[in-house]
Amino acid sequence: MWPQARLPPHPAMAEETRQSKLAAAKRKLKEYWQRNSPGVPAGAKRNRKTNGSIHETATSGGCHSPGDSATGIHGESPTSSATLKDLESPCQELAVVPDSRSVKVSQLKNTIKSLKQQNKQVEHQLEEEKKANNEKQKAERELEVQIQRLNIQKGKLNTDLYHTKRSLRYFEEESKDLAVRLQHSLQRKGELERALSAVTATQKKKAERQFSSRSKARMEWKLEQSMREQALLKAQLTQLKESLKEVQLERDEYAEHLKGERARWQQRMRKMSQEVCSLKKEKKHDKYRVEKLERSLSKLKHQMAEPLPPEPPAVPSEVELQHLRKELERVAGELQAQVEYNQRISLLNEGQKERLREQEERLQEQQERLPEQEERLQQLAEPQNSFKELNNENKSVLQLEQQVKELQEKLGKERLEAASQQKQQLTAQLSLMALPGEGDGGGHLDSEGEEAPRPIPSIPQDLESREAMSGFMDHLEEKADLSELVEKEELGFFQYYRERCHQKVYHPITKPGGSAKDAAPGGGHHQAGPGQGGDEGEAAGAAGDGVAAGGDYKGHSKFLVTAQNPAHEPSPGAPAPQELGAAHKHGDLCEVSLTDSVEPVQGEAREGSPHDNPTAQPIVQDHQEHPGLGSNCCVPFFCWAWLPRRRR
């Protein structure tokens, strides 16, 4: 048996080794023939050499039998009979040789066939490796291109994220600055209010000591100054509100932008999912085609593996072999192309899946950011809610103030009726008690009799003159106390007028073309519409109350001048109808004394106060529990801020 040769690295080298092996086998056959034929002459040896060369050239595909070589020798030299005779004996000897040579030749043929098959397999493997390398290189290039695209998209997304973060930081800083400025303005406002309250307290003390035209001028000047400061504060607050509105508009625009971006990403996700579905369908179709090709390939392999029918020793036709090779190459090429296509589709699917994952992560990040933005929006809406609460409190306070005013008017009427009755009693008593030589005292008594808030018991006519004089002097002392009380009530009225002026500043009339004079006839009795203008009605009512109070102040000053001027005193026995008419005309004096006597700022127990009247005590208590707008002047600004939003 011949030793099996190793697989050559290259087909050209395999061909050379095959030829060298064939030449070596031919040499060994020649040597064997020479050994078995010792009696052959030299000429025959030469002929054998020539025949051997001819035999080498003739047997390019394999080795022939010794009979064939002998026939070839006879065909070449028919003339020489000696050589024929000489060759007959070795041919006969060679015919007697055992069949081992034919067995060796068949073995050599089998080895040659196996080597050819191995050569084909190696060539096929080399082609497959080359194709696989080409596919890998193509896939690597495609992956590099996809990686570059992903890096570019990543850079763009990073820049967008940076810009969004920067804008968010900018908005946060602006909102913080606005909040700090608003806080400072509120602190400044509180300081100014405290300063104003301190100034009013000092002015009150000075007015209690001395009431003159100089103090009035100073008070008016300081009032104007405070009003200017309040106007400046109002302008600053309007600027802050405008900036806050701009920030809110920018916030809304940014929220809309985020919504649009989210819708865009969702649309892109839908497109990508549709593409993935189409790729999956194509992949299924390609799998089906691959299965078909694999079935056909398995059938071909099965057909090739089946034992062929016994053929004649002749070599099969090369045309059939070439046809089979072409079929096999075609099927292998189709299979390889299908495998390449499947690999590309799998790579594309992986890339699409990675993109979908990245987009899902981005959407999750945006969804995580949305609650933070909602919290910020809620934080921005918290001051608006506080404004609404303050607005509601302001409405309730105005309603309570209106109720208190109505009760005060009723109480003032009752007090006026009681005062008129007391005056009638006093005039009757003075006419009975009048003595000669006491006319001046009686005149002075009549001049101050209209301001007596308490009833004096009737004096019997059968008393002695000294007792009547002592009672009369006591009555005069009480009248002097009442005059002091009237001065205190006048100061309280000035303070009430100042608070109403502050309310005018803090409650501006927001209707276009409206003014304080137009709102004055309302007298505080205002009603808000169902949809809008509720705060406007409140502000107009407050301004109307202030104007009405100003008119009452003018009439009350005239009344005080007539009451305190001794030159215009009536005669002792006259009933003083002008004073009664003035008292009825300026009935707000009693109302002012009531409101001033119950204010917690003064805190002084006066004679003739409403605490003496049991019907006025619950009203006073209610007014102390629910003070008016003078105690909290910052509320109307918030009402002013909410008016344009309600109109929307």
UniProtKB/Swiss-Prot annotation:
Q: Where are the compositionally biased (Polar residues) regions?
A: 50-62
Q: Coiled-coil region(s) at which residues?
A: 105-160, 223-275, 318-424
Which residue windows does the record flag with biased composition (Gly residues)? 521-534
Q: Which region ranges are annotated with the description Disordered?
A: 1-84, 119-139, 356-376, 434-461, 508-549, 600-624
Alphabetized, the UniProt keywords read: Coiled coil
Top-level taxonomic group: Eukaryota
GO cellular component terms, A-Z: cis-Golgi network
Q: Which InterPro entries match?
A: GM130_C, GOLGA_cons_dom, Golgin_A
Q: Report biased composition (Pro residues) as residue ranges.
A: 1-11
Task: Report the family membership.
Answer: Belongs to the GOLGA8 family.
* Name the UniProt record assigns to this protein: Golgin subfamily A member 8G
Source organism: Homo sapiens
Instruction: Give the source lineage, highest ranks first.
Output: Eukaryota, Metazoa, Chordata, Craniata, Vertebrata
